[in-house]
């Protein structure tokens, strides 16, 4: 009986504390906030921004099996390999030249390159506004523009004419996407 009363009191106290919270949000003033431009005006951080663009090339949808399938298996430079019952997602279609635009390898290559282009456009947006050493700034901008050209080269090589995006876009703007 005593445990039941204690348990009931515990439940009532818990409900009281949970239901009697503040109604207003806690507003905290940022004292040491660093803007993105302050952060990037440090040369080491600007280099890290460009390294983030290079890093995109390590993603699975850049130069992995989807890319090999589109460039080597379809041209007979390579075979799907394995056993006939192992489809390798859509690689058996590429090996037989019966693939379609909705196959996963095509969307991987397409999405991977445009994700890289998105990164390059964001990097260029910030790099062009920085106040770092002009030689370093020009080098970083040239590296990022090269990577964007490489991504477009891959897209044109696989798909022909593609939409060209050369400025930073707001991914929340549904009209652009």
Range-by-range predicted roles:
Residues 1, 22-24, 53, 120, ...:
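Terminal processing/anchoring signals of secreted or surface-associated proteins
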Residues 1-30:
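Bacterial Sec-dependent N-terminal signal peptides
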Residues 22-29, 89-93, 162:
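Short, compositionally biased low-complexity segments
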Residues 22-74, 99:
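Membrane-proximal, proline-rich intrinsically disordered regions
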Residues 29, 156-167:
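Short, well-structured active-site flanking segments
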Residues 32-35, 97-99, 166-174:
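Short linear capping/connector segments at secondary-structure termini
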Residues 47, 55-59, 84-159, 173-176:
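Conserved, well-structured interaction surfaces
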Residues 74-77, 105:
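Primarily recognizes Gram-negative and organellar outer-membrane beta-barrels
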